[in-house]
């Protein structure tokens, strides 16, 4: 199956490039917009940089020389997502397709296809708690009061281990070490007209991480489904990397754009009416970090909850910081096209929560 996907992806790279902007209508971007978004990312976060194809014969003619893809190196990853990473275990799995799926329930509802982001439980229609709320349910089925986060509860066993008393085997297998680093690449895909993320891992000894071991750092729901091992198209030596398939990137981005615009419009309307705006302090990218920490990439239902709630005090979406004022508020948008990759990386992090993507973004 992985071979079939890889073959189809290589054929799709020959798709004619479109230079018509559809960023606001469907979440797709043109090569020119990809370059603008890359320039913004590099300017704001210097750990990112542009790179050229090697050899130059691998260059894509729709991108400038020297700006073929984006790269950041040495991104830390300190934990494996093995069986101890519970996630949403114990819940039914749901395939999330495009945003239209939430408007119909039948087998032929819009967006009905086999592809999509796999979401596991915790978001049924009857669930009243938001994605960040964890509640207990008693024997009668009643939902209890919200409990303290387990991270705030000290563990008695934490004090039992004396690190200095532990005898460590220096010859232990490096492949199982918890310390890894990743090089992250962002390339442009002309078929889907979106960015595509590639991951190349290294062991603590700076030795290349075998491709199959990279899957230890991918959330189990996505392994071999939306994340596969692919050759990086801009290198000649066919280096296998973990790649997040871009088939649904545009629809997810469109959902986020719509939600951010709706929140901005509501805030401006309240400001014109002289009303206090709950949670209106501008936290910029920090709002995005908090919003995506516990929301999975296919969790568009949770994203849409903010719109249905009318932007109340629980809606923690914050507008991106603007570098310039807009003369006409009616044309003001929450996320500009040059800020595309910043938001893109935030929801990509939900696939690889063990990789510290924010290490690359000083927020």
From Swiss-Prot:
GO terms for biological process: autophagosome assembly; autophagy of mitochondrion; glycophagy; piecemeal microautophagy of the nucleus; protein targeting to membrane; protein transport. The active site is at residue 247. Residues 84-174 are annotated as: Disordered. Keywords: Autophagy, Cytoplasm, Protein transport, Transport, Ubl conjugation pathway. GO terms for cellular component: cytosol; mitochondrion; phagophore; phagophore assembly site. Residues 84-171 are annotated as: Flexible region. Residues 84-106, 129-138 have a biased composition (Basic and acidic residues). GO terms for molecular function: Atg8-family ligase activity. Residues 139-164 have a biased composition (Acidic residues). It is found in: Cytoplasm. The N-terminal region is involved in phosphatidylethanolamine-binding and is required for atg8-PE conjugation. The flexible region (FR) is required for atg7-binding. E2 conjugating enzyme required for the cytoplasm to vacuole transport (Cvt) and autophagy. Required for selective autophagic degradation of the nucleus (nucleophagy) as well as for mitophagy which contributes to regulate mitochondrial quantity and quality by eliminating the mitochondria to a basal level to fulfill cellular energy requirements and preventing excess ROS production. Responsible for the E2-like covalent binding of phosphatidylethanolamine to the C-terminal Gly of atg8. This is Autophagy-related protein 3. It comes from Botryotinia fuckeliana (strain B05.10) (Noble rot fungus). The lineage of its organism: Eukaryota, Fungi, Dikarya, Ascomycota, Pezizomycotina. The gene is atg3.
